[in-house]
């Protein structure tokens, strides 16, 4: 008992395990017989794991009901999902195992409710699916198709970007009798409007294989340019991806190193008013890099200068003139520098002319103020006019002490003239202290000698 699935990627032959899962095999065979699976999309593709199909419209469509069993089609919505028992001996241990997608039955935990959706494994030993899906068949032919499905480009929900669909189903052998009311269609039906609404890139759509090499190269360059522009926008080099270079700016190269901004502006000013003209120079040395940017007020003047000045001899050098879009990186850096210079000339802060930086953030003013710092002395300073003795000590602390001692205020000098240079301490001076200590010891010594004589006199008595 086998079924042939004709898909958009090739044919797949499935052998049905009728003895182990008779009810699931009957459901699958009869759905194939009524052409229920025609135009069903592949979805839930998980690389090296599995893919799912069997919903004729697809789970992304609001018109989808998730599929139906053959008995639901014949008897009504009450039989849309039928309970099936899990075959105990069958496991998802081989690539190409086919099983019915199922959910647990609310009435019996040993049963699973299935409709029309089925799963095909893309890897070996997928025990995660054991006990969750009802196995009913094995793929015996078409493993190359399984590999193509495994390598397909998919979105974040697992649906292939280019549709993979079941085109036809062919029953090779059917051992089951048809249920009452089943009528086999004479030919494969056309896709419904709901099915056609789910098409992304049709499985038979040509993606440019008939284009010539030149057209393919042009298309590739356009895509690469858009990708690069988007990258520059993300990193902040461009304000937006579709930005266009200015059309009133000329790029002039092959200049003589001695050519100055004023010379170039004078030569090009005969074509119209020039807003800015700058020879680009090395930031470190200031030497000319031998190219410049000239910004005209009008695009017409810029175009006229472009046609007239190409190959003109300036300072013994034949210059090359082009529009700035041919060297967009150089033009961008020059434009940023020009905007900064203009902003500095206009004044203001943050693009608003009325704003002004706080004083602590004005680097130039701070530097100017620090350069004008000076020592300030009191006009009534009565420092000693006598020459200071030269100190033979090299200690900076001693010099600082002498400076502090010599630089007395007038108030302190008047105090010293009134009371003298006497110390504020109540203790006697050092030399007086030594004399007092010596007299004290002498008195004790005399008193001791006197006491000893008295003691000897008592002994004699």
From Swiss-Prot:
UniProt-listed Pfam families: Pro_isomerase (PF00160), RRM_1 (PF00076)
GO CC annotation: nucleus
**Could you list the residue ranges that cross the membrane?**
none
PROSITE patterns named in the record: CSA_PPIASE_2 (PS50072), RRM (PS50102)
Principal localisation: nucleus
Q: Where is the composition biased (Basic and acidic residues)?
A: 378-392, 400-461
SMART domains, A to Z: RRM
Q: Where is the PPIase cyclophilin-type domain?
A: 1-171
Where does the protein end up? Answer: Nucleus
Per the UniProt record, which EC number(s) apply here? 5.2.1.8
Catalytic reaction annotation? [protein]-peptidylproline (omega=180) = [protein]-peptidylproline (omega=0)
Q: What GO terms are given for molecular function?
A: peptidyl-prolyl cis-trans isomerase activity; RNA binding
Q: Which Gene3D superfamilies match?
A: 3.30.70.330, Cyclophilin-like (2.40.100.10)
Residue span(s) of domain RRM = 248-326
UniProt superkingdom: Eukaryota
List the residue ranges of the region (Disordered): 372-461
The intrachain disulfides are none
Keyword list, A-Z: Isomerase, Nucleus, RNA-binding, Rotamase
Q: Which InterPro entries match?
A: CRIP, Cyclophilin-like_dom_sf, Cyclophilin-type_PPIase_dom, Cyclophilin_PPIL4, Nucleotide-bd_a/b_plait_sf, RBD_domain_sf, RRM_dom
Family stated for the protein in its record: Belongs to the cyclophilin-type PPIase family. PPIL4 subfamily.
Q: What does this protein do?
A: PPIases accelerate the folding of proteins. It catalyzes the cis-trans isomerization of proline imidic peptide bonds in oligopeptides.
This protein is called Peptidyl-prolyl cis-trans isomerase-like 4
Q: Tell me the organism.
A: Emericella nidulans (strain FGSC A4 / ATCC 38163 / CBS 112.46 / NRRL 194 / M139) (Aspergillus nidulans)
